Amino acid sequence: MRAIILAAGRGMRLKQAEEDQLPKCLLRFGGMTLLERHLRLLRSAGVEDVVLALGWRHELVSAELDRIDWQPRPGIVLNPRYELGSVLTVHTVAEAMTRGGDVLLMDADVLYHDRIMAALTAGSKPTNRVLLDRDFEAGDEPVKLCVRAGVPIELRKQLAPDLKYDAIGESVGFFRFDEPGARRLAAIVSDYVASDRAHLPHEEAVRDFFREGSHAVEVADVTGSAWIEIDFPNDVSRAAHEVLPQLRPL
């Protein structure tokens, strides 16, 4: 199993002071960067093959890897046009996506309980899997995951008013793909780039993968497990004061 961590973006909505600007994966909680937390949680799940998709201030991420002396050292793939969007970032890691075996595709800017990692990586059988949190705040920001008859049918911030579903929640931003699934997603992403849609979020390509219906996808319910995606200044405070106290020491 291989983990691909998407950490190329600048995170403009976080509004960091210019002298303090860091890639979001280098934000610290409990004295540990999000990057180190990802690596520790992946190792605890038996995942040592890690690829980092980097862009903005990538040298700071490399310096953090030097500081913690993480071995085996994660591979690094650079997206020099990171400002375009995450579809292009996923396209830059196409080789890692299609190298074989199950692939975990993970946003870097998430602080989360180890139960979420366990749900993502559970089982030795190859599978496609998405994580659902039914306890989410309504609004335009969460990426909603809609499920009907156990099958994911929608993955978007904005939903059609007449959409019929059995369950709805927020997508945690972590996905698992088996080898055929990863190859198909890489092909969809390549089509996006070739058709001038590289500026779109990669969830749009994942949505297409789900809606094709040609690959079975499991939905793992992680409701009740603490996590937060860090996009805005208030998210940093919530991560430190609401989520971090619920996490087990790493």
Task: Write out the residue ranges for each language-model feature.
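Short catalytic helix/loop segments, enriched in acidic residues and glycine
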Residues: D20-E36
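N-terminal nucleotide-binding beta1-loop-alpha1 segment
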Residues: M1-E18
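Conserved N-terminal catalytic core of the sugar/cofactor nucleotidyltransferase
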Residues: R2-I5, M32-D102, S195-R197
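Conserved core of the sugar-phosphate nucleotidyltransferase
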Residues: H113-Y192
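Phosphate- and divalent-cation-binding pockets in alpha/beta enzyme and binding domains
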Residues: R13, L60-A63, R115, R184, ...
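Conserved alpha/beta core of the MobA/IspD/sugar-nucleotide pyrophosphorylase nucleotidyltransferase superfamily
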Residues: M1-A3, A167-L250
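Conserved beta-strand segments of alpha/beta enzyme cores
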Residues: C25, R73-G75, A216-E218
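Conserved beta-loop-beta/alpha segment of the NTase-like Rossmann-fold superfamily
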Residues: S62, D69-A149
